[in-house]
Amino acid sequence: MINRRYALLLIALGTLLLVSCVVSLGFGPARVPLDVVWRILLHKLFGFGVPDWNPGQEHIVWLIRVPRMLLGALVGAGLALIGAVLQAVTRNPLADPHLLGVTSGATLGAVIVVLHVGEIIGLLTLPIAAFIGALLSMLVVLMIASRHGRLDSDRLLLCGVAVSFVMMAIANLLLFMGDHRASSAVMFWMLGGLGLARWELLAVPTASVLFGLILLLGMARPLNALMAGEQTAVTLGLNARTVRLRVFLIASLMTGVLVSISGSIGFVGLMVPHIARRLVGAEHRRLLPVCVLLGSVFLVWVDVAARTMIAPEDLPIGVATAAIGGLFFIGLMRRR
């Protein structure tokens, strides 16, 4: 009975995600009727129908909104997945992808390149610079946290927060002293957004989310044991340090990839795992797929709100998720 309910929940969430993805393509500064969206998708994916729509509508839907929608679904899924496993290994309900220092490292890399190097390899310049910054930040956190051979969760989080503050201070100083026109460009990226979405940029985030999900699902039992406490994990024969290190590396690499293309989008990895646990409990083989689906649906619709609320301008997604996340946790605290 429980397995049947879980299967029905996955089917319902999967259906909701598919419907959300299609319906969201009609929203934006230029409205495209849903029947036109549907015909464009059928024609592009399966060759059905005769293109009797406006070429401008096809350009908007297929080249702008579909990549953006797919990137939003991937980023939402990835951040929710990372948040769930970090909350498990740290046993901290407030842990999220941005506590590891990776986001601030990506920000610093982006700031340095935009202000002092320029777009030497075109559209890929900013994502590559951000990813390199994220990797360097991850290595610094790891070196400091494991200096004395220990890698407990408190030390990991504290090192991540400390490195994050230092890197953000350097990034803000460079922005303050740099060219203001370039600063405004990188500021929008720092606030989070899906404006960089292009078909050619989707392969790497897709691979990172899929491989991350497979690897972390394979670690579901160790994650369950760590949630019960380090002593329980040791009793079951697990090496808590090794499990924690593997999760940290997977989470950091995924965060680096996602942040490099979407900027800093907060609260998804913090809020979605809490909602998922209320639906299916804390067993990670059941929890992680639900987190992925919920995170995707959530960010697809937040992006719709971001591009329609102050149209024709784009509201940074990080602003929208921060507002929703803050209200969510205020409501949660009031209920308790």
Language-model regions, residue ranges each:
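Alpha-helical transmembrane segments in inner-membrane proteins
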Residues: 1-336
